[in-house]
Amino acid sequence: RMSRGLGDVYKRQGNDDPIVSRVGQIMPHGEFYTFESKYEDEESKTCIPALVDEKIQEEIRGYALKVFKAIDGHGLSRVDFFLDKKTNKVYLNEINTMPGFTRISMYPQLMADYGIAYSDLIDKLIDLAFDR
């Protein structure tokens, strides 16, 4: 199956060969990323790519792929990490197999950065569901 207008990028991608986006970073307005800072105050910022060293970004991308494969992931997921700023050590926080999907959510923003429009992303995820 091939969704309209997705080109070669998806001919090679699928549940067994997932796309691993660049690393994104949430910079909350306050100390924590609360409901208010996410949806109301518009002061929090999303950085794509994350404002961390390229080596750390590659480490995070590698971990994200391993986590997705370890749970036999299909379709989409967002893998969240913490970074200890003092030691540059990366810690797994969670894998979210149904991440937020609004236009301001991190997952669609990361896919847009990868070159996949929101409507094309929806088409592709439907195709991946049928491939299961």
Q: Can you describe what each PLM-predicted range is?
A:
Residues 31-33, 102-110:
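A short, polar/charged loop-to-alpha-helix boundary motif
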Residues 10-12, 68-101, 111:
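Conserved metal-phosphate-binding beta-hairpin within the catalytic cores
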Residues 107-119:
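Short, flexible active-site recognition loops that position polar ligands and cofactors
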Residues 35, 48, 101:
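Short clusters of hydrophobic/aromatic residues that line enzyme substrate/ligand-binding pockets
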Residues 1-7:
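Single conserved hydrophobic/aromatic residue that forms the stacking wall/gate
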Residues 121-132:
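Cysteine/selenocysteine-centered motifs that mediate thiol-based redox chemistry or coordinate metal-sulfur cofactors
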